[in-house]
Amino acid sequence: MIKVQEYRGHIRNWEELCERLGISLLLPRKEREEEILVKAYETWGYEMADHMHGMFAFALWDEENNQLFCLRDPFGTKPFYYYETEDGTLLYGTTIRKIMEQPGFKKELNEEMLQLYLSLTYVAGENTFFRGLKKLMPGRYLIWKDGDRKSVV
């Protein structure tokens, strides 16, 4: 069973995907888009982003394979962050605040990123102002299986 754990965004080609995946066009937007995510993952797996157009970031829990699949749209319009705690727990979300509020998050300033920001006036790459907190880069996905980051592709 696939469960949507986190979702933020809008799928622009939802009508086409509903027809291809056998989803009712009459569902409310939130329910419809979550159903699209589940069916697209079941149908295309990690290649699901190749079929979706829009701005989105999400996390799906694949109960059968005991893994979390996180994906960010190719343009990076919607953010997605992740953080591994000292005990190996993955914290994730579409806002930094959500992650900061969870047990195990350490608020440690990433001084290197602050220095880069003050020099370049933007934050480049996957690092953030908090040590250990990473951005999932645009068009990339993260697989977390059995308490271990398997890949960021």
Protein language model features and the residues they cover:
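Cysteine-centered catalytic environments shared across enzyme families
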Residues: 1-153
